[in-house]
Regions:
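Serine-hydrolase catalytic machinery in alpha/beta-hydrolase-like enzymes
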Residues: 5-95, 192
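Core-facing hydrophobic residues within beta-strands of well-ordered domains
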Residues: 119, 176-177
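Acidic catalytic loop of the alpha/beta-hydrolase fold
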Residues: 156-161, 188
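Short beta-strand/loop motif that positions the catalytic acidic residue
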Residues: 145-147, 152-154, 158
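Catalytic histidine-centered segment of alpha/beta-hydrolase-like enzymes
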Residues: 185-196
Length: 208
């Protein structure tokens, strides 16, 4: 599949243009950028399924080529995702999906909770349910406010939350949602059996 560099106001990334009407803005985790191999593979899979995908760098990564995001800048990162969705709305006429990996998935879900009409669906890869070893510090306060359909993809060996913890946390979401478990995979989803068609199929079911 092919992609091309993309730039708009506050948005930097790569566009995977497809023939369908639906679109996706896809972003990375705290330690990476939009060139992460997993994001490239996910973008290619959805492009092949007819979805135009924008792989984008969050504002913190646009400012610094390495290092984690600062908590004080999280609102700026959400603003960057809002800008990415707006840019994609100019390119596609169909449904919009906001997707992210780890930190990116958390910011995507928080933005969707703040702005319920922003996107039709969320795809949240390796949502960081809590810091490793600290299950009391759940990051689910905004879950009851989610109104977009949501696909959660979680590794069975993810230290940021067990499958049981994730399943329990999702019970407070009233919007349609689905949890896909990748057996044997950790937080980076690199291990285990990971068929990308599971993602395209899961999102299609949610949006049907």
């Amino acid at each position: 599949m092919t992609s091309a560099p993309f730039a708009a106001e506050d948005v930097r990334g790569y566009l995977h243009k497809a023939g369908g009407v639906d679109g996706m803005a896809l972003t990375h985790g705290a330690g990476g950028n939009c060139k992460a191999p997993l994001l490239l593979a996910v973008a290619d899979a959805f492009q092949a399924a007819g979805v135009t995908v924008l792989r984008c760098d969050l504002p913190f990564r646009q400012q610094r080529p390495s290092g984690p995001p600062r908590p004080a800048d999280a609102a700026k990162d959400r603003a960057g995702l809002r800008a990415a969705v707006a840019a994609m709305r100019e390119l596609v006429t169909g449904r919009m999906v906001l997707a992210g990996l780890s930190y990116g998935s958390r910011q995507a879900s928080m933005l969707a909770a703040e702005e319920p009409q922003l996107v039709e669906a969320l795809m949240l890869l390796s949502y960081p349910l809590h810091p490793p070893g600290k299950p009391a510090q759940m990051r689910t306060g905004h879950f009851p406010e989610l109104r977009s359909r949501a696909l959660f993809v979680h590794g069975s060996k993810d230290p940021f939350g067990s499958v049981g913890e994730m399943a329990s946390a999702l019970r407070i979401i009233t919007a349609p949602h689905e949890l896909i478990v990748i057996e044997g995979a950790g937080h980076d989803l690199r291990r285990g059996r990971f068929d990308l068609n599971v993602l395209t199929g899961g999102l299609s079911r949610l949006l049907a």
